[in-house]
């Protein structure tokens, strides 16, 4: 019964009706979610991380719609569409729309000659699970638009555009790890990433009779609603204090635990603990990497 089908699928039907007669070239791009074996909050402190791509992914489909500037995007998960104009769009209060528009805005800053396009996306990365569903969404769209409009951007430019989308449109001052792992991850490999130099090394994760378990705590979080930016600001406050005595320090990456101890009475307890964690965590990442290699 087509009438009943239309009633149950009205949103999707009308979305595809917009483009069914003018679709030219449809591009489908995938980007993985990620786990981070060790290296928490070190990426935005120029530190080391040990992520790995997973088999959960975001899938984004895009195609030109024949207009100069109009874009229509369907979220398969939320069953909601969002329309915006390439010449005039701003962040909304919150939601997936900002991740999409943020990527578009950052590609435009790079000089991308975008035209009107439609798209839809879905994914298998659980939302709010800490496996970087947002980075996977951003990266899959960036890759798809790069192919659709033959923009010629390299992987690093796409990674950086996805990260800056989160900074400038979503409002989260995230590090580079999530987007880097989403684009550069390899099957059955972990990656040691230096978040300052962006040098990285792949190696197989061979655990013998042991396995890594990824457990669902059923606790959902959103970086935009969390204390993520606050934690970053606390780390930066610690660096600012330390720089008064050690001006060559650029980030907590450059600070030793001995140096940090000199400021224990000058830093708040919370800021001191944040800094202490980062310094120790960098050492733990390198120790874990060496252990996994042997």
Model segments located where?
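Intrinsically disordered, low-complexity segments enriched in serine/proline and basic residues
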Residues: 2-13
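Residue-level detector of intrinsically disordered terminal segments
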Residues: 11, 21-22
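ATP-binding N-lobe of GHMP and related small-molecule kinases
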Residues: 22-135, 142-155, 160, 164, ...
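C-terminal nucleotide
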Residues: 22-34, 38, 59, 63-93, ...
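Short acidic, glycine/serine/threonine-rich loops at helix termini
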Residues: 49, 130-133, 170-175, 193, ...
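Short glycine/threonine-rich loop-to-helix capping motif typified by GTGT followed
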Residues: 130-136, 261-266
